Curated annotation (Swiss-Prot):
This is Ribosomal RNA large subunit methyltransferase E. The lineage of its organism: Bacteria, Pseudomonadati, Pseudomonadota, Gammaproteobacteria, Pseudomonadales. The gene is rlmE. Keywords: Cytoplasm, Methyltransferase, rRNA processing, S-adenosyl-L-methionine, Transferase. Pfam families: FtsJ. One of its GO terms (cellular component) is cytoplasm.
Length: 209
């Protein structure tokens, strides 16, 4: 079957993308690794020995970066609806994060302890229709924030991919209520035409009793 013009243009952009070439050279599974590395360079989110949850982890670019930074004394729980090839010392939970059963598996993996950081690169399959895509994207963001509120230690941090659009302002307000400091990040490795940004919440205020 002949490729569409859109598909051809995507393939051309993909293979000409310097971050794709860097990922292949550096041994990372996706160009997304450089988004996290750039944020890490600026904000020093990830430190040795930390306990981290990585949502939307497949194919594993963020988990690779995080695993290397937290080292053998750290703990990383990764989850995605898609399969992900194993990474040493990473606990992977495959399933749909919108399902209660998958959330329960993540909480079981966390156990009675708390985590230092929740990161999420989740995004729904995009249809190109903002009226459809934004509610789906914001729903995933809300679920990730709810998980963060349940598992983070006081002072913990939260990093999530988010798209500007309907629901963003309300979500930003919710994060500000939960964290001492909230900032936006747009890594240079994020494609110019993409509306994605990363919202960073620092200093979890703790759960209200």
């Amino acid at each position: 079957m002949a490729r569409s013009k859109t598909s051809h243009n995507w393939l051309k952009e993909h293979f000409n993308d310097p971050f794709v070439k860097m990922a292949q050279k550096d041994g990372y599974r996706s160009r997304a690794s450089y988004k996290l590395l750039e944020i890490q360079e600026k904000d020093r989110l990830i430190r040795p020995g930390m306990s981290v949850i990585d949502l939307g982890a497949a194919p594993g670019g963020w988990s690779q970066v995080t695993s290397r930074l937290i080292g053998g004394q750290g703990r990383l729980i990764a989850s995605d609806i898609l399969e992900m090839d194993s990474i040493p010392d990473v606990t992977f939970i495959q399933g749909d994060f919108t399902e209660d059963a998958v959330l329960a598996q993540i909480l079981e993996a966390v156990g009675n302890s708390e985590v230092d950081l929740v990161i999420s690169d989740m995004a729904p399959n995009m249809s190109g229709l903002a009226a459809v895509d934004m509610p789906r994207a914001m729903f995933l963001c809300e679920l990730a924030l709810d998980l963060a509120g349940r598992v983070l230690r006081p002072g913990g941090d939260f990093l999530i991919k988010i798209f500007q659009g309907e629901g963003f302002d309300e979500y930003h307000k919710s994060v500000r209520q939960m964290f001492e400091k909230v900032q936006m990040r747009k890594p240079s490795s994020s494609r110019d035409r993409s509306r994605e940004q990363y919202l960073l919440g620092r200093g979890f205020r703790g759960r209200s009793e």
